[in-house]
């Protein structure tokens, strides 16, 4: 599949012009929303994206440690280690991180959605959530494959335990439900405990 050059994608990002006492100032739309403490986690979860999200979380904490941060998620998932860097930072910083699923939150995206502050995790009505076990595909010597298999089993157990804590579901239920791809509607995700509510309009 042909991928558009980054310069083309950047050109498609809208700019917002504000009038200030010193004249006009322009921001790309994401930078302007960052001023409102809104962060977008969109696309594959990987190291570069994780570094950007972590940096934004730390910046907003330094700006105002007592104000909530709003993390909007539309992601098919991705790297567990990159996702855990974001997750750990969400738990580490002082501000509550409110998570909102727009579109989809699958795999590590769903884990980050569930990792938001208690009572502040939301889905929009037509979003989809999917949980499953970590994926692994390894090649090489048998001993190396065995090492990787052991590692992924350890990660699976850790993620399941953490998901049980965030959802309130028994660990054995999480283990059963993540054995294969498990898709949920926004309402089902709320009933399961992955989010606290489904919101159609701002209050």
Curated annotation (Swiss-Prot):
Enzyme Commission no: 3.4.21.92
Source taxon at top rank: Bacteria
Residues at the catalytic site: 107 (nucleophile), 132
Compartment(s) of residence: Cytoplasm
GO molecular function: ATP-dependent peptidase activity; ATPase binding; serine-type endopeptidase activity
Top-level EC class: hydrolase
A GO cellular component annotation in the UniProt record: cytoplasm
Biological process per Gene Ontology, one example term: protein quality control for misfolded or incompletely synthesized proteins
Keyword annotations of the record: Cytoplasm, Hydrolase, Protease, Serine protease
Family designation: Belongs to the peptidase S14 family.
NCBIfam families associated with the record: clpP, PRK00277.1, PRK12553.1
Subunit comment: Fourteen ClpP subunits assemble into 2 heptameric rings which stack back to back to give a disk-like structure with a central cavity, resembling the structure of eukaryotic proteasomes.
HAMAP family: ClpP
Role description: Cleaves peptides in various proteins in a process that requires ATP hydrolysis. Has a chymotrypsin-like activity. Plays a major role in the degradation of misfolded proteins.
Protein name per UniProt: ATP-dependent Clp protease proteolytic subunit
Species per Swiss-Prot/TrEMBL record: Shewanella pealeana (strain ATCC 700345 / ANG-SQ1)
């Amino acid at each position: 599949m042909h991928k558009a050059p980054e310069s083309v994608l950047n050109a498609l990002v809208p700019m917002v012009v504000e009038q200030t006492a010193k004249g006009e100032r322009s921001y790309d739309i994401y930078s302007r929303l960052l001023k409102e403490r809104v962060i977008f986690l969109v696309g594959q979860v990987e190291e570069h994206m994780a570094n950007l999200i972590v940096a934004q979380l730390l910046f907003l904490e330094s700006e105002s440690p007592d104000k909530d941060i709003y993390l909007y998620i539309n992601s098919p998932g991705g790297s567990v280690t990159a996702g855990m860097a974001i997750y750990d930072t969400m738990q580490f910083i002082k501000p509550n991180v409110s998570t909102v699923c727009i579109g989809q939150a699958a795999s590590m995206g769903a884990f980050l959605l569930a990792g938001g502050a208690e009572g502040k995790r939301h889905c929009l009505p037509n979003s989809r959530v999917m949980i499953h076990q970590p994926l692994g595909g390894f090649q090489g010597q048998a001993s190396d494959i065995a090492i990787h298999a052991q590692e992924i089993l350890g990660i699976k157990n850790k993620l399941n335990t953490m998901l049980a804590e965030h959802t309130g579901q028994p660990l054995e239920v999480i283990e059963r439900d993540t054995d294969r791809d498990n898709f949920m509607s926004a309402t089902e995700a709320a009933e399961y405990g992955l989010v606290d509510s489904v919101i159609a309009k701002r209050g």
